[in-house]
Structures are given as structure tokens and as C-alpha cells.
Amino acid sequence: MADINLKGMGVALITPFKEDESVDYEALGKLVDYQVQNGTDYLVVLGTTAETPTLTEEEKKNIISLVVTRVRGRIPIVLGVGGNCTRSVVEKLKTDNFEGIDAILSVVPYYNKPSQEGIYQHYKAIANATHLPIVLYNVPGRTGVNMTAETTLRIAREFDNVIAVKEASGNITQMDDIIKNKPARFNVISGDDGITFPLMTLGAVGVISVIGNAFPREFSRMVRLALAGDYDSARTIHHSFTELFSLLFVDGNPAGAKSMLNMMGFIENKLRLPLVPTRIVTYEKIREVLRQLSIKC
């Protein structure tokens, strides 16, 4: 198993689309460069923010190839590999080409709402199917089921290649329970930009960020300051983004992030159905906040 450190700010990359809704690979390449050059510690490819369920298998392969080629080993790449059919996920892990991939992010099975034992058995099968480091992903607002602290810790203790959990349950008490009782080699990563700072004061090691798509330099600085224990300086940056945290998700993710990147000139403001762009009122509110942050748009 490769030695990988996912402390700091990872960015869950969006997938840019052209006006005809084809993937804008040129824009994606520029976004990757923007991330690498502005302090992002690692990239997460084909996660929720990438609109992955709307992508074809060919598009997914092309995106992975582009990101790996563009990054050139400068920062780690984490690939989203998950699903609600354990057998299919295991088969994918055994047969796909993972050259250039440093770890995988695997979401709790969604829709079919497994029990805690089912979640454990799912991740056991995944851990036994790959040599790659695994980041668990708990996001009950999307999956319909919460992976409890007890289950998370059970998996963390039993499988050495399970190295972290991306926690997006919104339950600070649950996250703190994991932080207090986890193995030393296992880390908790925030899955929510808005609670990253408070969670890091409890011992989380960073975030897989959405807002970092637009603000990699600023948000990664906040994370580094928090890791260094400079909570006063980190708090100041956190507070500067407070209004934007909520605005980005008013009309769903990644609609808010794409609105920001559109205003900043990176991408077309296109999503694939069933997702749609932010409402005009939300778009204008985001624009006003960006102006207050002195971002040209």
C-alpha cells in the first residue's frame, strides 16, 4: 500500500460542460492547473461535485486520464469509486486501471439503506479488493443512511488500507467520537466547507472542499493555519467565507460552485439534468459576495 498523507485541503473537482453539455476538457485542464498552482494539497476526481452519475464510462476514463496527465505526480489524486452494489464496486476495483491514482474515495451505499452490519461488510469487501488506500465517505443526506461512529471505528481498526473518513453527516458529536477513539493512522476529513474550521479544532486534519474550486489559495491557507494551531488567523478566513458557505448549496451542488467559476471566467454555467444552474436571485447574491471578497466578476 502506498504511503499517502491526505492532510490539508483536497478539492472535489467539478466537471465543466460546454453549451452543448459535452465535457469541456480544455476548461478542466485549466482548472487542474489552477488548483496545483494555488496550494491545493490533493484532488478528488469523479466525486459528487463532478456530477459523476451523469457521465458516461468513456467520459470518466477521459477525465481521469486528463487529470493524471495534467497533475504529473505533483499532488495526490483521489478517485471516487463507489456504488450500492458491492459486487460491482469490487469488480471495478479488481479490473480497472488505477495508474496515477493514489487513493480511492468510496461512499456509503445509497438508496438501498443497508444496516450497520451491511455497511461494514460492504467496506470489508472493498478493502480486500484493492491495495489502494481507501477513504470512507459518510454523507447520510445523500445516501439515506448514516454510518455510525461505532461502524466507522470498527472498519478503521480492522483494515490497514482504510486511512480516513470524509465525514459529512453534520453531526459534530459523532465526528468528535470518531476523532477521540480512532487509531493513530486513521484521520477524519471534513466533508463540509462550513464546518471545516470548527472540526479541525477538534482534531480533523482537513477538508475535501467544494469552495476550493474557486478559492484554493485562500481556503488551503485557512486549513494550514488550523493544522499549525493558529486558530485566530484561521478563524478570520473562515468568517470571511461564512455567507458564501450557505449560498453555494441553496440550489444544490455543484450549481453554486459552477456559478462562481462562471463569474470568474473559468467555465460555462452548464450542468446536466436533473441538475440545473442556480436561480438568477442566487447567482446575483453569489456575485455580490464575490465582489465583497474583491474577486473580479
From Swiss-Prot:
<dbReference type="InterPro" id="IPR020625">
    <property type="entry name" value="Schiff_base-form_aldolases_AS"/>
</dbReference>
<dbReference type="Pfam" id="PF00701">
    <property type="entry name" value="DHDPS"/>
</dbReference>
<feature type="site" description="Part of a proton relay during catalysis">
    <location>
        <position position="111"/>
    </location>
</feature>
<dbReference type="GO" id="GO:0008840">
    <property type="term" value="F:4-hydroxy-tetrahydrodipicolinate synthase activity"/>
</dbReference>
<comment type="similarity">
    <text>Belongs to the DapA family.</text>
</comment>
<comment type="subunit">
    <text>Homotetramer; dimer of dimers.</text>
</comment>
<feature type="site" description="Part of a proton relay during catalysis">
    <location>
        <position position="48"/>
    </location>
</feature>
<dbReference type="GO" id="GO:0005829">
    <property type="term" value="C:cytosol"/>
</dbReference>
<dbReference type="InterPro" id="IPR005263">
    <property type="entry name" value="DapA"/>
</dbReference>
<feature type="binding site">
    <location>
        <position position="49"/>
    </location>
    <ligand>
        <name>pyruvate</name>
    </ligand>
</feature>
<keyword id="KW-0704">Schiff base</keyword>
<feature type="active site" description="Proton donor/acceptor">
    <location>
        <position position="137"/>
    </location>
</feature>
<keyword id="KW-0028">Amino-acid biosynthesis</keyword>
<comment type="function">
    <text>Catalyzes the condensation of (S)-aspartate-beta-semialdehyde [(S)-ASA] and pyruvate to 4-hydroxy-tetrahydrodipicolinate (HTPA).</text>
</comment>
<dbReference type="GO" id="GO:0019877">
    <property type="term" value="P:diaminopimelate biosynthetic process"/>
</dbReference>
<keyword id="KW-0963">Cytoplasm</keyword>
<keyword id="KW-0456">Lyase</keyword>
<keyword id="KW-0220">Diaminopimelate biosynthesis</keyword>
<comment type="pathway">
    <text>Amino-acid biosynthesis; L-lysine biosynthesis via DAP pathway; (S)-tetrahydrodipicolinate from L-aspartate: step 3/4.</text>
</comment>
<feature type="active site" description="Schiff-base intermediate with substrate">
    <location>
        <position position="166"/>
    </location>
</feature>
<dbReference type="InterPro" id="IPR013785">
    <property type="entry name" value="Aldolase_TIM"/>
</dbReference>
<protein>
    <recommendedName>
        <fullName>4-hydroxy-tetrahydrodipicolinate synthase</fullName>
        <ecNumber>4.3.3.7</ecNumber>
    </recommendedName>
</protein>
<keyword id="KW-0457">Lysine biosynthesis</keyword>
<dbReference type="InterPro" id="IPR002220">
    <property type="entry name" value="DapA-like"/>
</dbReference>
<dbReference type="GO" id="GO:0009089">
    <property type="term" value="P:lysine biosynthetic process via diaminopimelate"/>
</dbReference>
<feature type="binding site">
    <location>
        <position position="208"/>
    </location>
    <ligand>
        <name>pyruvate</name>
    </ligand>
</feature>
